[in-house]
Amino acid sequence: MQSEFSIPDSNVRTPLVFTREELSFHVLDDAGRKTNELLTLVSEMESKWNSGISSEQEAKAGIVFTPTVNWIKGCYALASKLKSDLGMDVRYFSGEKPKQSSLKGDKFDTYKQKVQNDFKANKYRLLTATKAFGMGVNKTNIAYTIHYGIPSSMEALYQEAGRAGRDKKLFTETPANCYVLMTKENNTDALDEIWDVSTSIPDLKKSAKKLDFE
């Protein structure tokens, strides 16, 4: 960027510290039970941050970041799962329309705008989203983020987790929570079967299930 805009070195300012004291980072091994771990974690966060509130306007919010839009690990399916199991108003946000969605044409763009506006207005407090969720959204009461899998890069983790704790006054004494759910790779045999061209379709499905692939 410095080169593109011909900015001299004297005008470049580099922060000495990149950490944010209002954020607390945690990496959890979900032992291959990612969905169950997510449900438990969201319940814990709701109990921690929203116990005793009388309205959505008082609530702290959370974002679950997913690597994909579709399938059971995508933001669309996870929003439905969280809503069903936890009895909460949970919505999803993605750049592209989910394959399962019935919205067509401009209706999906209208949906995305409403989801974003309602989230900023505290009309609901839990959102599942891909990285498409706008960096320009400055919502000050996000108390936790959860990455449903390893982020694409450390920069992505820092930017997405950084949606939390925007109001330093709210999170000085108790930092906002930023979680990453990961599964340690210990399924060498199952992976070998998946890549073996001689593996039958039924065996391929069994191996994929072991790895929680869909």
Report residues per predicted region:
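Interdomain hinge/linker at the junction between the two RecA-like core domains of SF2 helicases
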Residues: 1-49
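C-terminal helicase lobe
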Residues: 35-133, 137-214
